[in-house]
Amino acid sequence: EKARKMIEEAVVERVSDIYLIPRGENYQVYHRIMDEREYIQELAEDEVMAIISHFKFLAGLNVGEKRRSQQGSCDYNYVSGEISLRLSTVGDYRGKESLVIRLLYDQDQQLKFWFGALERIAQEIKGRGLYLFSGPVGSGKTTLMYQLARLKFPDKQILTIEDPVEIKQEDMLQLQLNEAIGATYDNLIKLSLRHRPDLLIIGEIRDAETARAVIRASLTGATVFSTVHARSVAGVYARMLELGVSPEELNNALQGIAYQRLIGGGGVVDFAKGNYQNHSSDKWNEQIECLLAAGHISPRQAETEKIVLGSTA
């Protein structure tokens, strides 16, 4: 009951992550909404252990293992409906376990984009190759990829690889990671190419192995959408190099980079088709100034949302 109430309250607040962290003899609960982490309450250790065991059981994790890290996911039923959860646990040096719960909301909705960004990007997607999307947690990256997929690839073979599947679609072949049976990003990408998809959507490039697999897929003639964690267009390019992709391979495969945030009730997108390393933040900052002038955001928020040269990672 405590666990269910915890999820219900988080959904109402549109929380992206719930943290259960050991502090002394008790546990502290935090919520993350966009980029802000907020302290919620302190709970007794036995209460939290019961909550963690509850979620681990539902996600098929080893309930008795408290030191080694474990990851899993589940669909969680509560009073108002169902939500997908992604779970990550790890024990500290004392053997006290922490849990982070990522809430994956049903994003199958038409996200509003400022300044005609959706149509503008759709016009730029013309050839095969790799298109990368980036932005903070909850900024609508997956929603943008799916909206572009429906707009540009109607009645085409679309295959997705995610961890877990965030937007369930009957007209797409959707695969979900399961490392226990060898269903890794690398293996599923190899498998997916045998299905000859018109569009391959890969949830996230997290490591060098996935980065290489994504590059290979895009160089074999497929159109590939994927996400990378970075704070700007230039940061996405730099991150791919950090993951071991050579500049030659990246330049051959890459067809565009989109960076986005949810600002003033809609998506603001910066899109580039080349010269990624030296991409100027001027157009992004001009969009922020327009939102400020129209009264959609405050002066303080405008300063926070602007991209300063050098903030790329």
PLM segments and residue spans:
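Short, flexible helix-loop junctions that flank or precede catalytic/ligand sites
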Residues: 1-313
